[in-house]
Amino acid sequence: MAEKNSHIRNFSIIAHIDHGKSTLADRLLEHTGTVTKREAQAQFLDNMELERERGITIKAQTVRMKYRAKDGRDYELNLIDTPGHVDFAYEVSRSMAACEGAILVVDATQGVEAQTLANVYQALDHDLEIVPVINKIDLPSADVEGVRQEIEEVIGLDAKDAVPASAKEGIGIGEILEQIVHRVPAPEGDPDAPLKAIVFDSWYDSYRGVVMLVRVFEGTVRPKQKIRLWSNRKEFEVQELGVFAPFAKAVGELQAGEVGVVVANVKDVHDAKVGDTITDAARPTEEPFPGFKVVKPMVFSGVFPIEAADYEQLRDALEKLSLNDSAFTYEPETSQALGFGFRCGYLGLLHMEIVQERLEREYQLALITTAPSVVYRVTDTSGAVEEIDNPAKLPPVQKIAKLEEPHLTCHIHARTEDVGAILKLCQERRGLQRDLKYLGTKRVQITYDIPLAEVVFDFFDKLKSVSRGYASLDYELKGYEEADLVKLDILINGEPVDALSVIVHRERAYQRGRDLCQRLREVIPKQMYEVAIQAAIGAKVIARETVKAFRKNVLAKCYGGDISRKRKLLEKQKEGKKRMKQVGSVEIPQEAFLAVLKVEE
């Protein structure tokens, strides 16, 4: 191992949402004097307004700290801040590949949660040295010994050295830094070997093009050097190199073991994919990093501007978003009901909410979003297989030989008293129980196979509400399985509204159709004629609701007298309504599209 690297430590922080990861990062920055008290705003590394507000980390961030340890040596610590949410699992795994160690933060009041576990296993897969930290010991309900035991039982890590800390109060921070220095191994790698570096994040800067966050494993990268990206063989010239300490500053070179920023005239963020390998164009390395994959979106929804005039603006906004987010995809689509818009693909539900919120917030757009759907695999009668992300594109029933839908393996961590409610929820969502094991006396881990389409709606919210917020969920894609699915169309006055159609399981179709019609009846305003709302599978109508018409009291000026006079007036009114119905079109409000989303309650 090169002597040069012995002072470098690359580490990340693993934690479940809200266990205090970003606060701990802030304290480390302050303790090492990287950030002055004046600059230290809360959650320093979460740059996006949205990240701060939701208290989650979306993009990976890095920062370099200088630290003088108790042994009198100066160390360079590179903290790689990873997203903790399950939607961004691939980004987490790439960030881990760039480290040698990880701080495992566990909340002293909550114990080990599902996402903590998922990330720990990933860290162990990458052979990282794990430093456990028990955070939030300043809270009255903290149970340090219980959590220590739990770390040993559930994860199987030795927790006798676990540092009790409180990031908020700044307790135990020095001890954590000492442990990083002594326990996390220094990076290996030869600065003179052919260049080999991994990209673990990239974003778009309007002045410099694509900025890549890299960890150099072998060799050295310098300005003016020609580099090659492994996955697409494209070559670029390095413009500038830098590190975040914590604000960007330029450096002359990045050597094996270092983490930094490379700017190299790359124009398209899709060229610099997360997990790709960078090497020297003149003397390339033998082989790339294993495990590179192009992330595929799992959840799709239509996004339409409420004002047709905003279409161009929406397109620009999506383009800018996709510059920073290579996992997000979009393509134009038209809907008879909603006009022109886009079909967007996301990694998962959180990702979808974030993208939609950023569109509305950063680009001030008023949008309608259709119900999220997943990618179905359709085999038609001729044997051709097609992937369909939009219910409107489903071929007619006669032509479908089989329909398959994606399934997830879900790991749910919960308190023992909530098991019944959670099992019931999973059963309702067509889940198949795979495993149930008790972790100690208070916690339980439940494993289920659940179709993605059932999770997409509001599974997460429901899980949180049946467990009073204590359950946590982690999932991975298991594969496709055949299912008895049908397309449910919604007709309004006999006209199908494409944006309201959904693909559902046949057993659920009646219930779902009825619920949908009832919901729509509440949100579609009364017209001058009656409006029929129907749910149909193919040509068979399975549910109907009617929105009654407004009517003027035409009999107000008849006093007593003959019934035939009244009948004449009523018949005349009826004729008029009938004529109106032939030419009238029903305005469908935004709430109607949201009604499709919230059917389950």
Swiss-Prot record:
CDD domains on file: EF4_II, EF4_III, LepA, lepA_C
Record-level GO BP terms: positive regulation of translation
GO molecular function term, any single one: ribosome binding
Keyword check for Lyase: no
Alphabetical list of SUPFAM superfamilies matching this protein: EF-G C-terminal domain-like (SSF54980), P-loop containing nucleoside triphosphate hydrolases (SSF52540), Translation proteins (SSF50447)
Name this protein carries in UniProt: Elongation factor 4
GO annotation, cellular component aspect: plasma membrane
Catalytic activity: GTP + H2O = GDP + phosphate + H(+)
Entry binding sites for GTP: 18-23, 135-138
Enzyme Commission number(s): 3.6.5.n1
NCBIfam families the record matches: lepA (TIGR01393), small_GTP (TIGR00231)
HAMAP family according to UniProt: LepA
Membrane-topology annotation of the record: Peripheral membrane protein
Family: Belongs to the TRAFAC class translation factor GTPase superfamily. Classic translation factor GTPase family. LepA subfamily.
Taxonomic source organism: Anaeromyxobacter sp. (strain K)
Function (record text): Required for accurate and efficient protein synthesis under certain stress conditions. May act as a fidelity factor of the translation reaction, by catalyzing a one-codon backward translocation of tRNAs on improperly translocated ribosomes. Back-translocation proceeds from a post-translocation (POST) complex to a pre-translocation (PRE) complex, thus giving elongation factor G a second chance to translocate the tRNAs correctly. Binds to ribosomes in a GTP-dependent manner.
InterPro entries: EF-4 (IPR006297), EFG_III/V (IPR035647), EFG_V-like (IPR000640), EFTu-like_2 (IPR004161), G_TR_CS (IPR031157), LepA_C_sf (IPR038363), LepA_CTD (IPR013842), LepA_IV (IPR035654)
Domain (tr-type G): residue spans on this chain: 6-188
Keywords: Cell inner membrane, Cell membrane, GTP-binding, Hydrolase, Membrane, Nucleotide-binding, Protein biosynthesis
Subcellular localization: Cell inner membrane
